């Protein structure tokens, strides 16, 4: 391992000890905000520190085995050779592990997120497919024991959704789901198709991190246009009696957010503000990313909603993930929420891409 990397790891080990000492300081314990921030930092350092301590121990074991190998006793020499082999193998494994742990982390990976699904080309069939995608994500969320809360729906005339927005809450949800952003295409025979012809339609998926209030960008109230209207769709008689639905328009960017799934106007407004903040932040982040990444390739794509990332071919039972040339003949399982077969290879490819970029620097 490079000396510069060793020095960086030694610095992290030192910082870990500092943070641990601070967490037992009465002055820090009484300051909830600082205690929370240090606890988060300690948690983030834990994996890399544990791996580096194992790396240091394996390095010591290798040196001890080398010393033993210089002994005249043939039995000791043989034992030393075996120990050297084991230590070298462990060091290689730990070096790979540490390289990945040292990769720059997306600060939003641990955040909750919003999933927005919109029907695109394909009319009624696109709306039905948007409903299928929403069900797929709901099943995946359930399998992870996360929480899903529907924030806004615009139902299709023959089923599914023209648009659906949901919030997913849980540990590391944005980091798991962020690669779902982009164009999703379906190829299948619609139920209304009498000739048995395969139709192609599409949906866009946008995954945005929820921005904590303490980190949220400040939105000038003068830049907001607020409209109230009566909620449509399910909800009983109540929806016809009060203007509980909210539409927020951010005038400088033109971003519009509607929320109507809560019965109270106050709750709908709070949720709409959360989504609006996330969208504005995403625009700012994309500007920054474009500037930073203009010189390097990103294998898993930019998450641009216009980029076609995946095709679901029902006649062949096939899912094709175009960004990493992955083809699975497990369409039914994927549509039932078994997404790890796609998400895990995407995350590994992203790590490989980042490692390649670091080695070029």
Curated annotation (Swiss-Prot):
Asked if the keyword Protein biosynthesis belongs to this entry, the reply reads yes
Name a GO CC annotation attached to this entry: cytoplasm
Cite the SUPFAM superfamilies for this sequence. Release factor
Q: Where, per UniProt, does this protein localize?
A: Cytoplasm
| InterPro entries the UniProt entry points to | PCRF, Pep_chain_release_fac_I, Pep_chain_release_fac_I_sf, Prokaryotic/Mito_RF, RF-1
Chain intervals with Basic and acidic residues compositional bias = 285-296
Single GO MF descriptor: translation release factor activity, codon specific
Q: Which residues carry this modification: N5-methylglutamine?
A: 237
Source species, domain of life: Bacteria
Is this entry keyworded Cytoplasm?
Answer: yes
Q: Which UniProt keywords apply?
A: Cytoplasm, Methylation, Protein biosynthesis
Pfam families this protein is in?
PCRF (PF03462), RF-1 (PF00472)
What SMART domains does the record tag this protein with? Answer: PCRF (SM00937)
Quick one: where's region Disordered? 285-305
Function field: Peptide chain release factor 1 directs the termination of translation in response to the peptide chain termination codons UAG and UAA.
Which NCBIfam families does UniProt cross-reference here? prfA (TIGR00019), PRK00591.1 (NF001859)
Family from the record: Belongs to the prokaryotic/mitochondrial release factor family.
Q: Which HAMAP family match?
A: Rel_fac_1 (MF_00093)
Protein name listed in UniProt: Peptide chain release factor 1
UniProt lists the gene as: prfA
């Amino acid at each position: 391992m490079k000396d510069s990397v060793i020095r960086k790891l030694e610095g992290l080990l030192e910082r870990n000890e500092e943070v641990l000492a601070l967490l037992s300081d009465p002055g820090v314990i009484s300051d909830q905000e600082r205690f929370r921030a240090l606890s988060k930092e300690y948690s983030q350092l834990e994996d890399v520190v544990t791996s580096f301590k194992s790396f240091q121990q394996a390095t010591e074991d290798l040196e001890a085995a080398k010393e033993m190998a210089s002994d005249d006793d043939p039995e000791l020499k043989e034992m030393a050779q075996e120990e050297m082999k084991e230590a070298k193998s462990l060091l290689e494994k730990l070096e790979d592990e540490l390289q990945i742990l040292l990769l720059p982390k997306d600060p939003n990976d641990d955040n909750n997120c919003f999933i927005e699904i919109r029907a695109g080309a394909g009319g009624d069939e696109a709306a039905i497919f948007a409903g299928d995608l929403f069900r797929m994500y709901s099943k995946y969320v359930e399998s992870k024991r996360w929480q899903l809360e529907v924030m806004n729906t615009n139902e299709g005339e023959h089923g599914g959704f023209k648009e659906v927005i949901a919030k997913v809450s849980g540990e590391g949800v944005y980091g798991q789901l962020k690669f779902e952003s982009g164009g999703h295409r379906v190829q299948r025979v619609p139920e209304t198709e009498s000739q048995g012809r395969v139709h192609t339609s599409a949906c866009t998926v946008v995954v945005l991190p929820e921005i904590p209030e303490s980190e949220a960008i400040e939105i000038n109230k003068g830049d907001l246009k607020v409209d109230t209207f009566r909620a449509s769709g399910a909800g009983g008689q109540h929806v016809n009696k009060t203007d509980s639905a909210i539409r927020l328009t951010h005038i400088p960017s033109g971003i519009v957010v509607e929320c109507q799934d809560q019965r109270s106007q106050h709750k709908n407004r709070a949720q709409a503000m959360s989504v609006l903040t996330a969208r504005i932040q995403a625009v700012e982040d994309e500007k920054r990313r474009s500037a930073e990444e203009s010189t390097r390739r990103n294998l898993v794509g930019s998450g641009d909603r216009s980029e076609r990332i995946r095709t679901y071919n029902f006649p062949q039972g096939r899912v094709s993930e175009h960004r990493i040339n992955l083809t699975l003949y497990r369409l039914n399982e994927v549509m039932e929420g078994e997404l790890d077969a796609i998400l895990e290879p995407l995350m590994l490819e992203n790590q490989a891409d980042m490692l390649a970029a670091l080695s070029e620097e």
